[in-house]
């Protein structure tokens, strides 16, 4: 038997109770040692959050660029106009991420990368773009800056990498089917991704 729950402390108490009950009637295997495994999706989240720290500055620059464009209808209109000039299909929605949810960072980067040429041309059309992204956030704390080629390269690679994690997360988070038997295979796949 396998029990999969989220990481709430009340669940730890419930699983401990279940383990004690099973041990008292001698129905557990290995004393219930493997009865409760942490949620695979939560473990994946911890792995990805740690990895995001490696390219944090690039993510901050892309995020700031999106925030600038979305912060006003005239800016967004100019952005869409540049997308037409650059013949960039502008169906992807520019969204900001929630910093604590890596899957939203994945969605943000995936959409932003489709507009890389537009972001590259935007400073030519709006001088305030560069000024604002370089301006101090608060006294003594510089702005993140304008995303450069290195940042976009990081964003593309990270979006591709996170896409794999998104697929694994979907597979282990299924709520209408049993996933306990796939855990080892999925973690093995993650191990291969990380080692590449």
Task: Locate the predicted segments by residue.
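A eukaryotic "domain-edge + linker/cap" signature
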Residues: 1-196
């Amino acid at each position: 038997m396998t029990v999969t729950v989220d990481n709430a402390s009340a669940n730890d108490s419930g699983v401990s109770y279940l383990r004690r009950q099973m041990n008292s009637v001698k129905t557990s295997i290995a004393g219930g040692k493997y009865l409760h495994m942490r949620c695979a999706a939560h473990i994946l989240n911890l792995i990805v959050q740690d990895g995001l720290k490696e390219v944090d500055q690039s993510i901050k620059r892309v995020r700031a660029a999106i925030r600038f464009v979305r912060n006003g209808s005239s800016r967004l209109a100019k952005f869409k106009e540049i997308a037409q000039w650059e013949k960039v299909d502008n169906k992807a929605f520019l969204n900001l991420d929630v910093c604590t949810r890596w899957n939203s960072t994945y969605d943000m980067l995936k959409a932003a990368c489709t507009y890389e040429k537009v972001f590259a041309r935007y400073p030519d059309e709006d001088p305030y773009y560069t000024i604002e992204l370089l301006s101090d956030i608060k006294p003594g704390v510089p702005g993140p800056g304008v995303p450069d080629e290195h940042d976009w390269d990081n964003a593309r690679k990270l979006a591709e990498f996170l896409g794999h994690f998104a697929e694994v997360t979907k597979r282990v988070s299924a709520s209408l089917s049993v996933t306990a038997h796939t855990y080892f295979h999925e973690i093995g796949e993650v191990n291969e991704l990380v080692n590449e």
